[in-house]
Amino acid sequence: KKTILALFLVLNFFSYAQDQLNLNYYLPQGITYNPSVPTPKEVIGHEVGEWHVTHDKLMFYMQTLAEASDRITIENRGATFEGRPILLLTITTPKNHQNIEQIRQEHITLTESNSNVDISEMPIIVYQGFSIHGNEPSGANAGLAYAYYLAAAQGPEIEAMLDDMVILMDPSYNPDGLQRFAYWANTNKSINLVADNNEREYHEVWPGGRTNHYWFDMNRDWLPVQLPE
């Protein structure tokens, strides 16, 4: 009886923990957020981490953020072999967005040996890409909360940070692999989380979500640069 009671309490604890999941868990405390910028749940229908985000939901949220925030512009750089968009977000202050071409040209000038550019007021460029392997999904899922923070956080700290940098954000390096993995994991997920490594959810069928459409490991394309991703 004691064993059954203990098992019952453990199951209820994990069910309660799942029910308490919300965006505040991931965000810095003591910061106000622009209410006109939608949270991930308001757009994709679930909290960050409640389900593995599919690529279509990830892209929909990023496009929605770009429409809601003057800190974000979005560019479609092409499509994967399965036709999924390859998006790039540019995140900075509205002032930097107005001068983005000038900032780009100044950074190009820095590569010239005889350049004489004053870098004291030049914003730095930060490139961030997420989940190059589709079944390493924490990056793409964290990207939901991260992009929301950059778009909606208010106060002098975030304003100063974005004034000093231009963030280029690729929410998903490997859209086809991410979609393949998310479908598998969500399809085989239990209503209550299961930590047992033998659970079907954790064992994808071959080829899994690591690779792109042609089962190519994206880490092998840094030098040849032959794939659209």
Where are these regions (language model features)?
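The substrate-binding groove and active-site-proximal loops of carbohydrate-active enzymes
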Residues: 46-52, 132-136, 214-228
